[in-house]
């Protein structure tokens, strides 16, 4: 039986691990990130992949850095025939890449060579793409640059956010892996080199990318809001206070108002002018220190009115 070591960390990785188990491979170990403090109370929380592994009685390793010699030796002691990774979060050292007889393969959430890096799902929406997908490729010491083994496309709906697209890609990745691993073991694949000239990157989201710039077009802002939902969430300011924007709708609303101006207060939320004729109806918001709420609840309690401006530290007189 083929001995597999699986490496992954977040929710995206769980269906991938589960598929390997259900397909009957001998998963001899799981490598994941260390437990991290989570939430306001900073409770030490295990990664989702660790929880899944323990449910199946699979040994778990949690190295801070898998490149350290003693950590490499722990993985090699498991004698893997194949290493499979999915959103592990670390680049593997050469000693690990060269060890398994069937190599090391990675399940990546984009159509490589586009969107290499740690946040491909976010960027596919931020950039307004209509489709993305899964690529399974051999791992090399360079980020997401190995030869491609298999691909599948996944449509991005106009209403998708990072959460919904993540779930679709996670399922697609598990299915593609199930179809791909037997071919890798049998040697019946023809890996395709990536075209470096077409490579684009999706580095982890930075804080400045979360701030809404109302001078951008309505379409760009709409994509930014859904491309940061459910994490880390786009924000603006109102009366000097941060205001998270979870969801919006595009509204055709030609106006001479400055970008960021509240042009109307509706039952469903507030309509805000942008840098073009597509305004945004903000339908889910979260004022500082409060819970996420529907636009209608925000309107009832926020004392916001037409003419107010978002995105500046404006205090009402």
Curated annotation (Swiss-Prot):
It catalyses: L-methionyl-tRNA(fMet) + (6R)-10-formyltetrahydrofolate = N-formyl-L-methionyl-tRNA(fMet) + (6S)-5,6,7,8-tetrahydrofolate + H(+). One of its GO terms (biological process) is conversion of methionyl-tRNA to N-formyl-methionyl-tRNA. It is an enzyme of class 2 (transferase). Its EC number is 2.1.2.9. Keywords: Protein biosynthesis, Transferase. InterPro entries: Fmt (IPR005794), Formyl_trans_C (IPR005793), Formyl_trans_C_sf (IPR037022), Formyl_transf_N (IPR002376), Formyl_transf_N_sf (IPR036477), Formyl_transferase-like_C_sf (IPR011034), GART_AS (IPR001555), Met-tRNA-FMT_C (IPR044135). The keyword Methyltransferase does not apply. One of its GO terms (molecular function) is methionyl-tRNA formyltransferase activity. GO terms for cellular component: cytosol. Gene3D superfamilies: Formyl transferase, C-terminal domain (3.10.25.10), Formyl transferase, N-terminal domain (3.40.50.170). (6S)-5,6,7,8-tetrahydrofolate binds at residues 110-113. Pfam families: Formyl_trans_C, Formyl_trans_N. It comes from the Bacteria. Belongs to the Fmt family. Attaches a formyl group to the free amino group of methionyl-tRNA(fMet). The formyl group appears to play a dual role in the initiator identity of N-formylmethionyl-tRNA by promoting its recognition by IF2 and preventing the misappropriation of this tRNA by the elongation apparatus. This is Methionyl-tRNA formyltransferase. It comes from Bacillus subtilis (strain 168).
């Amino acid at each position: 039986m083929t001995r597999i070591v699986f490496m992954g960390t977040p929710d995206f990785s769980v269906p991938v691990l589960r598929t390997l188990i259900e397909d009957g491979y001998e998963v001899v170990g799981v490598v994941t990130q260390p437990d991290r403090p989570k939430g306001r109370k900073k409770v030490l929380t295990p990664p989702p992949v660790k929880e899944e592994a323990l449910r199946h009685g699979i040994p778990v390793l949690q190295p801070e850095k898998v490149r350290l010699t003693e950590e490499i030796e722990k993985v090699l002691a498991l004698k893997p025939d194949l290493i499979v990774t999915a959103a592990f979060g670390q680049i593997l050292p050469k000693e690990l890449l060269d060890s398994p007889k069937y190599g090391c393969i990675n399940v990546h959430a984009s159509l490589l060579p586009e969107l290499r890096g740690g946040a491909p799902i976010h960027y596919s929406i931020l950039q307004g793409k209509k489709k993305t997908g899964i690529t399974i490729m051999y791992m090399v010491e360079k980020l997401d640059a190995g030869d491609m083994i298999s691909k599948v496309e996944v449509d991005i709906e106009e209403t998708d956010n990072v959460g919904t697209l993540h779930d679709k890609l996670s399922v697609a990745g598990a299915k593609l892996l199930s179809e791909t691993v037997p071919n890798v073991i049998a040697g019946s694949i023809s890996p395709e080199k990536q075209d470096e000239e077409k490579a684009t990157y999706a580095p982890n989201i930075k804080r400045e990318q979360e701030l809404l710039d109302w001078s951008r077009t309505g379409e760009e802002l709409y994509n930014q809001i859904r491309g940061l939902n459910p994490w880390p969430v786009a924000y603006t300011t109102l009366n000097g206070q941060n205001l998270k924007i979870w969801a919006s709708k595009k509204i055709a609303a030609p106006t001479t108002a400055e970008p960021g101006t509240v042009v109307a207060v509706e039952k469903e939320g507030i309509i805000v002018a942008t840098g073009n004729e597509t305004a945004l109806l903000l339908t889910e918001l979260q004022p500082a220190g409060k819970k996420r709420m529907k636009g209608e609840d925000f309107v009832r309690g926020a004392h916001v009115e037409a003419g107010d401006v978002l995105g500046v530290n404006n205090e009402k007189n």
